[in-house]
């Protein structure tokens, strides 16, 4: 994913945590914040060290990033932070995708219906 689509600075994360809305399911917590300055979404991913070793954490992050790449055209211009919870470490890529799509629909980040 290009740099323009990433949230990297701690101050950005803190602002979204403070001012954004959160939605959760068992596997993920999603914070969203309407960013009026950008014409596209920005994504921040947080996977705690409690979830496992670096291989496990990176696998989860890759699956989350891939899901956003697939739906790139259908996502509203918002700042989005995805936090992985403990059950996500035991899921395969397809399960992560369906769970993430579920929580993103609840968070209303899609601009049209997703199957």
From Swiss-Prot:
GO cellular component, as recorded: ribonuclease P complex
Keywords noted in UniProt: Endonuclease, Hydrolase, Nuclease, RNA-binding, tRNA processing
GO MF assignments: 3'-tRNA processing endoribonuclease activity; ribonuclease P activity; tRNA binding
Keyword Kinase applies: no
Class of the enzyme per the UniProt entry, highest EC level: hydrolase
Keyword presence, RNA-binding: yes
Endpoints of the signal sequence: none
Single GO BP term: tRNA 5'-leader removal
The reaction(s) this protein catalyses: Endonucleolytic cleavage of RNA, removing 5'-extranucleotides from tRNA precursor
Pfam families in the record: Ribonuclease_P
Entry EC number(s): 3.1.26.5
Organism domain of life: Bacteria
InterPro entries cross-referenced by the UniProt entry: Ribosomal_Su5_D2-typ_SF, Ribsml_uS5_D2-typ_fold_subgr, RNase_P, RNase_P_CS
Alphabetized PANTHER family for the sequence: RIBONUCLEASE P PROTEIN COMPONENT
Known function: RNaseP catalyzes the removal of the 5'-leader sequence from pre-tRNA to produce the mature 5'-terminus. It can also cleave other RNA substrates such as 4.5S RNA. The protein component plays an auxiliary but essential role in vivo by binding to the 5'-leader sequence and broadening the substrate specificity of the ribozyme.
Complexes and interactors: Consists of a catalytic RNA component (M1 or rnpB) and a protein subunit.
Family (UniProt): Belongs to the RnpA family.
Protein name: Ribonuclease P protein component
Lineage: Bacteria, Bacillati, Bacillota, Bacilli, Bacillales
Gene: rnpA
């Amino acid at each position: 994913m290009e740099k323009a689509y990433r949230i990297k600075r701690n101050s950005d994360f803190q602002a979204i945590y403070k001012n954004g809305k959160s939605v959760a399911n068992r596997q993920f917590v999603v914070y969203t914040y309407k960013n009026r300055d950008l014409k596209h979404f920005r994504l921040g991913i947080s996977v705690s060290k409690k979830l496992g070793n670096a291989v496990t954490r990176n696998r989860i992050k890759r699956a989350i990033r891939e899901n956003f790449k697939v739906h790139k055209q259908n996502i509203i211009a918002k700042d989005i932070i995805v936090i992985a919870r403990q059950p996500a470490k035991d899921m395969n890529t397809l399960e992560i995708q369906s769970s993430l799509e579920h929580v993103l629909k609840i968070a209303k980040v899609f601009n049209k219906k997703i199957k």
